[in-house]
């Protein structure tokens, strides 16, 4: 995968949770770094559709 589906938020959530669940990345910060997306921008995109990264569960809900 060479980019995240930033324009399709439900697909973005699914992709992030897949990458975290399969332990490809340890947390959202690592995903943002790898795909060159600012964490603040990622949080804004997720929040625009009512989603947020939950560190306690290491997933987006």
Label the predicted regions.
Residues 37-50:
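Short acidic, Pro/Gly- and aromatic-enriched capping/linker segments at domain boundaries
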Residues 31-32:
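Short alpha-helical "recognition helix" segments of helix-turn-helix
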Residues 1-25:
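N-terminal acidic leader/helix
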């Amino acid at each position: 995968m060479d980019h995240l589906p930033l324009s399709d938020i439900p697909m973005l959530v699914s992709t992030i949770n897949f990458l975290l669940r399969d332990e490809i990345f340890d947390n959202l910060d690592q995903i943002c770094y790898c795909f060159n997306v600012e964490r603040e921008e990622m949080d804004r995109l997720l929040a625009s559709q009512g989603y947020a990264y939950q560190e306690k569960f290491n997933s987006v809900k």
